[in-house]
Each structure stands twice: as C-alpha cells, then as structure tokens.
Amino acid sequence: MPLTVKCPTCQTEVTWDETSKFKPFCSDRCKLIDLGDWAAEKNAIPVKPEFDPEMLDQLGYDEADFFMDDGSMDDKKQ
C-alpha cells in the first residue's frame, strides 16, 4: 500500500512515490503558492534570539555605543 500525504497547501491526498512529480504538493501551483508564502514571510521557523535586547539595557549598553567610531580599528585597516 503506497504512502499518502496531504498537500500542505490544499489538503488534497497525494501518493508518495516516484511518480509524484511535486511531492509533497499535489501540483506545481500548490508548490508555488507555498514558495510565495515563505517569500512573503507568512511562514517562519521559530528561533530563539541570540541575545535579549533588554539584557543589553541591564548591562548598560546603549544603541549609540554600537555605532561609535573611536578610532580603535584604524590600526587594523593598514
């Protein structure tokens, strides 16, 4: 018995085998709709932020500190 899955876009049953040209989608149209949703950022993979902006505030960092040119990189540019 072949494995069947539902198309992520329209929920149509799709047979999962070598003959399924657009798996897991039922058609090229559904595949492109899904791609468009990802491109428009309607879908997203949740990730944990690398740092908490509030933590930077607690440590005393100010946004202006990140963009200051104090000349410390001048020696490394040469």
Swiss-Prot record:
<comment type="subunit">
    <text>Interacts with GyrB.</text>
</comment>
<keyword id="KW-0479">Metal-binding</keyword>
<comment type="similarity">
    <text>Belongs to the DNA gyrase inhibitor YacG family.</text>
</comment>
<comment type="function">
    <text>Inhibits all the catalytic activities of DNA gyrase by preventing its interaction with DNA. Acts by binding directly to the C-terminal domain of GyrB, which probably disrupts DNA binding by the gyrase.</text>
</comment>
<keyword id="KW-0862">Zinc</keyword>
<feature type="binding site">
    <location>
        <position position="30"/>
    </location>
    <ligand>
        <name>Zn(2+)</name>
    </ligand>
</feature>
<protein>
    <recommendedName>
        <fullName>DNA gyrase inhibitor YacG</fullName>
    </recommendedName>
</protein>
<dbReference type="GO" id="GO:0008270">
    <property type="term" value="F:zinc ion binding"/>
</dbReference>
<feature type="binding site">
    <location>
        <position position="10"/>
    </location>
    <ligand>
        <name>Zn(2+)</name>
    </ligand>
</feature>
<dbReference type="InterPro" id="IPR013088">
    <property type="entry name" value="Znf_NHR/GATA"/>
</dbReference>
<dbReference type="InterPro" id="IPR005584">
    <property type="entry name" value="DNA_gyrase_inhibitor_YacG"/>
</dbReference>
<feature type="binding site">
    <location>
        <position position="7"/>
    </location>
    <ligand>
        <name>Zn(2+)</name>
    </ligand>
</feature>
<dbReference type="GO" id="GO:0008657">
    <property type="term" value="F:DNA topoisomerase type II (double strand cut, ATP-hydrolyzing) inhibitor activity"/>
</dbReference>
<dbReference type="GO" id="GO:0006355">
    <property type="term" value="P:regulation of DNA-templated transcription"/>
</dbReference>
<dbReference type="Pfam" id="PF03884">
    <property type="entry name" value="YacG"/>
</dbReference>
<feature type="binding site">
    <location>
        <position position="26"/>
    </location>
    <ligand>
        <name>Zn(2+)</name>
    </ligand>
</feature>
